[in-house]
């Protein structure tokens, strides 16, 4: 069984969860669920980044103790992830003792390697990034990621990390391991950044009290990124022996705005400490409205709870990942256009195509076979023309779509995985129209043909449920149950041997209810 350690960026505890947080977690969860279907030993970690100046300032503005503040924020995030069916195995928080011990151990190891020294920093600081910035990185005197925030001039004595020493090793690793930074556009961005050389970076702050004490110097706290990045190893037991059982990570899932930290600083820290690098860092794009600029009233319309309530958590997961390619940005011109597309996609793909296919299939099996699913095996040698026998064309299309789905999911092209699954649904609906089971049912000589049609439709629905289960775990389990399936969904290669025998009693509710007009 292959090990697959998967992480997302930990969420900063200075506000409420929003659609951007959800997009990353849902995508990573789909990958985790797919890998479990493949039989991998998956360990999936998410969490909270709870230290730093912004958290301290936010808590103080509310008259709160920072620890009490982050405890409450963590509860909000946990509640949302539970509602969205995020199947994480661990939820790491940077205020936990296990994390702080790991940070201290890592810094001590880097220090023993001679890569920590003290110096005075003079330059610019972006409070939005909580990062020091070179003048060459600014656009019109502002941070390009936080153009509404004022850039601060700062001077303080800090501990520094010799990042500049790792430029050549980083380039060599990236060029030798093409999969290390994905998609390719992000890899090229990082290689371009490295061509200009690297400066050493601060590893501590002397003016921020809310953080992990810097090892050996309580007057300093660990710089927020030096604190946050090691969560990926603290969550799996670093520096204890159990750490080796899960590390290295197979995949770090992050947003495109933090590639510099994850593809330059983090691997350099690991190199210094003699720790193996993660296999892949995947930097996804953003889902945006009008380039990300929203009024307060527009932001309220995109409240995460309200969006999930609109059509339910599974539909939200499905539509978000279907509409937004995992490797690029998706920008909607207005909030209303996003909501309209959400509704249109829900009605077309789920209520109409998938929901109607399930309803038609179940109804015909009840009507024509008294609820018993015909035991007709798929023809493993069927050709794409479907000329050999009724049912062959749909079985062939389903198999081909499942191969396309598997290739897309292996490449983390999640929207293409969804499209492959929906190809089966469209093929199945067309197959019903072409084969006309209602006519076959009236012909006593067409019994075998009708059995083949109904059996192929059930296979197509089960295949669709398996393929869409990483995206809609609840609804796909319900499809399986409505077809008479028992226990968990079959794995992708075990569908034929797990087909149900009988459709259960009719239910009054529909799988994807249409909203009341």
Model-derived regions, located:
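Structural signal for well-ordered, non-membrane alpha-helices
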Residues: 78-81, 107, 111, 355, ...
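A short small-residue
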Residues: 9, 52-59, 86, 328-340, ...
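Basic, alpha-helical terminal appendages of large translation-related enzymes
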Residues: 1-3, 43, 47, 119-124, ...
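Long, amphipathic alpha-helical stalk/connector segments used for oligomerization, subunit docking
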Residues: 325-328, 332, 336-351, 361-380, ...
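N-terminal, positively charged nucleic-acid-binding surface of large information/translation enzymes
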Residues: 1-180
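Generic structural concept
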Residues: 351, 355, 395, 399, ...
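Structured secondary-structure scaffolds
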Residues: 2-46, 98-102, 152-367, 419-421
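N-terminal alpha-helical segment
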Residues: 51, 300, 397-402, 460
């Amino acid at each position: 069984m292959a090990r697959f350690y998967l992480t997302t960026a930990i969420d900063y505890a200075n506000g409420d969860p929003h659609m951007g947080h959800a997009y990353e977690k849902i995508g990573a969860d789909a990958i985790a669920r797919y890998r479990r279907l493949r039989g991998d030993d998956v360990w999936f970690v998410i969490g909270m980044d709870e230290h730093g100046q912004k958290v301290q300032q936010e808590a103080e503005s509310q008259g709160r103790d920072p620890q009490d503040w982050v405890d409450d924020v963590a509860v909000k995030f946990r509640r949302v992830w539970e509602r969205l069916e995020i199947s994480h195995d661990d939820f790491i928080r940077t205020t936990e003792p296990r994390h702080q011990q790991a940070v201290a151990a890592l810094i001590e190891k880097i220090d023993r390697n001679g890569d920590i020294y003290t110096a005075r920093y003079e330059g610019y600081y972006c409070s939005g990034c909580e990062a020091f910035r070179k003048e060459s990185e600014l656009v019109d005197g502002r941070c390009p990621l936080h153009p509404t925030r004022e850039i601060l001039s700062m001077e303080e004595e800090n501990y520094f990390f010799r990042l500049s020493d790792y430029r050549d090793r980083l380039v060599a690793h990236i060029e030798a391991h093409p999969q290390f930074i994905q998609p390719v556009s992000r890899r090229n961005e990082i290689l371009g950044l490295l061509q200009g050389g690297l400066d050493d970076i601060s590893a501590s702050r002397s003016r921020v009290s809310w953080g992990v004490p810097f090892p050996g110097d309580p007057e300093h706290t660990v710089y927020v990124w030096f604190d946050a990045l090691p969560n990926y190893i603290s969550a799996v037991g670093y520096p204890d022996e159990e750490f080796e059982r899960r590390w290295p990570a197979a995949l770090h899932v992050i947003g495109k705005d933090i590639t510099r930290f994850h593809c330059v600083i983090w691997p350099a820290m690991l190199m210094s400490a003699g720790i193996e690098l993660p296999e892949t860092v995947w930097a996804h794009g953003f889902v945006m409205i009008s380039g990300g600029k929203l009024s307060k009233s527009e932001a309220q319309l995109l409240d995460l709870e309200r969006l999930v309530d609109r059509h339910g958590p599974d539909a939200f997961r499905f539509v978000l990942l279907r509409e937004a390619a995992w490797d690029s940005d998706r920008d909607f011109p207005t909030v209303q256009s996003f909501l309209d597309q959400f509704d249109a996609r829900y009605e077309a793909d789920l209520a109409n195509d998938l929901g109607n296919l399930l309803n038609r299939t179940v109804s015909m099996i009840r009507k024509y076979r008294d609820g018993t699913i015909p035991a007709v095996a798929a023809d493993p040698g069927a050709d794409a023309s479907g000329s050999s026998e009724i049912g062959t064309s749909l079985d062939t299309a389903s198999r081909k779509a499942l191969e396309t789905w598997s290739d897309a999911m292996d490449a983390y092209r999640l929207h293409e995985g969804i499209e492959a699954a929906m190809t089966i649904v469209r093929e199945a609906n067309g197959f019903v129209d072409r084969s006309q089971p209602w006519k076959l049912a009236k012909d006593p000589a067409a019994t075998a043909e009708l059995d083949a049609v109904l059996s192929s439709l059930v296979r197509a629905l089960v295949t669709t449920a398996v393929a869409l289960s990483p995206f809609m775990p609840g609804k796909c389990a319900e499809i399986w149950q409505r077809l008479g399936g028992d226990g968990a969904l079959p794995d992708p290669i075990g569908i034929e041997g797990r087909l149900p025998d009988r459709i259960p009693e009719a239910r009054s509710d529909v799988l994807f209810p249409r909203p009341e007009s």
